[in-house]
Structure formats: structure tokens, C-alpha cells
Amino acid sequence: MTNGNSKNFEVIRKYFKNGCLNQYDTLLSLLHHRLPYLKNAGIILKLYQSSAIAVTNNSKNIQINSYQANYNHAIAMKNYLEKKISKYVTGVFLHGSLGTNELVQYSDFDALVILNHSTFNSKQSLINVATTLKKSERIMQKMDPLQHHGWFILTEKELEDFPTRYFPPSLFEYAKCLMGNNRFQIHFQNENGADTEDKV
């Protein structure tokens, strides 16, 4: 991923954490949690729309098995997201111990969401998706009250210039698809020789 695109998507991911892009936004959130989302939505839309798709030299077909286990927090998450934002989601994937079905007492909720282009069609859709994902982290915290991270977030545009350092493609091998598309293709740059064996 090019440096310019990488920085843009880092800011976009920061927005999805809590809407805050700077310290002033953090203070603003004390007045109401939605205010930073409202204030910064326009900035995020411009960043997304201005992010160019780079020419990449590797591609990989991804196919992920559907989630078959019946763990109550995973099912609660699926039901919540399907009800609230399913039309904005390309896919939701469980990885870590949830993906391999090797849960232990201290397991946390490791999950990736890939957001489609329609998330970034308007401020309203962007704010809706961002605040819904933030609220859904309550389900993660019910599984693990010490959960130290929320969602891993990617956008549909990033599938064309995949951020391998943020989410190594090898993690898909141990993931399960909770909802959405379980087959897609990613394109990525060589980074220190990483993933060259996946070229198709």
C-alpha cells in the first residue's frame, strides 16, 4: 500500500474507533459520544474518495468457511449487525481463538469487518455504521471485560491495495465468515518479500 493511501486509511480506522481524530475531539466526546462522529464525517468521506487504487503485483483468492459453531456472543454479534448495518458490510470474519474454535477463559473477541463502498456514500451512512460498530463492542466486552481492542476494520477499496502489515493475509486461513461474502480476491504489494508465494 502506498504511503499516502496508508495514512488515509489509518485516519479512517481511527474515526471508526470513537470518531475522534485529535485531542479536541476527545473533549467533545465528553459532551456527547456522537459529536466527534458528526464533526469528522466530512473529512473521512473526502479521505476515502481521494484514496487512489495503486497498481499491485500480487493477488490472492480468499475463500473462508462459514462460522458453524454456536458461541452465544458470536451469534449475538451476527444478529445485531445483520439487523443494523448488513447492507454496508462486505463481510465479517472471526479470527484468533473464535475462528479456530479453541476458546479459553481469557479469549477475546478477534474480528474483522470489511465495509463496502456504500458506507462512504453519505455522512449519514458513515455515522450510522461507525456508531453501530462502536456499540457492538459491548458484545465483545461481555465475552471479555478486559478486551483491549475493538474491530479490525478494512474497506472494500483496500481489497485492491491490501494492507498486509495491518492484517496479514495468512490470518484468513484460520478465520471463519460470520456474515457476508466468504469469497473475494485481494491485491497487494510485495513488502520485504512477504506473501510472494501467494501470487496467482
What is each PLM-predicted segment?
Residues 1, 77, 115, 140-143, ...:
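Detector for methionine-enriched segments
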Residues 1-93:
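Helical scaffold of the NTase/Pol beta-like nucleotidyltransferase catalytic core
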Residues 32-33, 73, 95, 117, ...:
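Histidine (H) residue identity feature
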Residues 45, 49-69, 123-124, 129-200:
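Conserved NTP/Mg2+-binding pocket subregion across the NTase superfamily
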Residues 77, 94-97, 134-136, 156:
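Sparse, context-dependent recognition of short Cys/His-centered cofactor- or disulfide-binding micro-motifs
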Residues 78-109, 113-121:
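Active-site nucleotide-donor binding segment shared across nucleotidyl transfer reactions
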